[in-house]
Amino acid sequence: MDDLKVLIGKVATGATLTREEAAAAFNSMMSGEATPSQMGGLLMALRVRGETVDEITGAVSAMRSMMLRVKAPVDAVDVVGTGGDGSGSVNVSTCASFIVAGAGVTVAKHGNRALSSRSGAADCLAALGIRIDLTPEQVGRCINEAGIGFMFAPAHHPAMKNVGPTRVELATRTIFNLLGPLSNPAGVRRQMVGVFSRQWVQPLAQVLKNHGSESAWVVHGSDGLDEITLAGPTFVAALEDGNIRTFEVTPEDAGLERADGDALKGGDAEANAASLRAVLEGKPGAFRDVALLNAAAALIVAGKAKTLKEGVALGAKSLDGGGALNKLKQLIAVSNG
């Protein structure tokens, strides 16, 4: 506790924490040792000053050390967004996950209930008939038998209950909004991560590299979406062969037409689930296109595609051949088995 007071004092002066100091501070918070006032003070001091790559790397270390792990193949991928983009859109990364799985890539998806929309990944999947309150062993069985599994964040990060009340009272974004997508309980090393702000694209790619990721895309749409957008360019930081490259992609790069955000407005969990199922059943339109675009990037990360156009073609085959829909049916069956 005294150590934490020293670290809070350090951050309060505008100084930055080392990875080790950040890990110690977040261990103190997530273990329940820190008081609510100490948590709130540290989280807001970091937020106001701006969190560094080393601080996020250390916080992720603490979070990963306490999570309940899931066994998954080494080549599994995660398609995940931070949420909090305020768009209220349909569940793009969830739909893309089924497309990727239908293309033959194992998906270990990590997610939560809604942050700023009316339907997060967990809400949508539950509305589709998938059981989300599974043990790590049950999720592992889904991944092995269905080729896709969903890890409901609160079930795998029980230590988060110690910081939950403080986060609710602060009612503003904190470093914890960034940590979830970086703390996959299956330990995946191939990630497609959407973030709510352009400022985090390159830093989070660096954090993933620091934690041993082999291949990753961190993305932010120019319209604010925490996905690759159809509305215009998307900012990307790609981790490939130990190097991070930043660039922009557009729908045209993938052979797709632009569409504005209104075409992707979502509803509640039931409405979003129905929209997702319609795409998996072959319905054309903007939701199909944006899901294909994001799936294409995940297929590049998985090493299945070299370009977005190639990824879109593979994804279209997954949809039109019934592979993606079959993955949904398999996950419903295995999760309820």
Curated annotation (Swiss-Prot):
Q: Which residues bind Mg(2+) 1?
A: S93, E227
Single Gene Ontology MF annotation:
magnesium ion binding
The alphabetized UniProt keywords are:
Amino-acid biosynthesis, Aromatic amino acid biosynthesis, Glycosyltransferase, Magnesium, Metal-binding, Transferase, Tryptophan biosynthesis
Annotated anthranilate 2 binding lies at R167
Single GO cellular component term: cytosol
Q: Which cofactor does it need?
A: Mg(2+)
**Gene Ontology annotations of biological process type:** L-tryptophan biosynthetic process
State the protein's purpose: Catalyzes the transfer of the phosphoribosyl group of 5-phosphorylribose-1-pyrophosphate (PRPP) to anthranilate to yield N-(5'-phosphoribosyl)-anthranilate (PRA).
Recorded protein name is Anthranilate phosphoribosyltransferase
| Protein species of origin | Nitrobacter winogradskyi (strain ATCC 25391 / DSM 10237 / CIP 104748 / NCIMB 11846 / Nb-255)
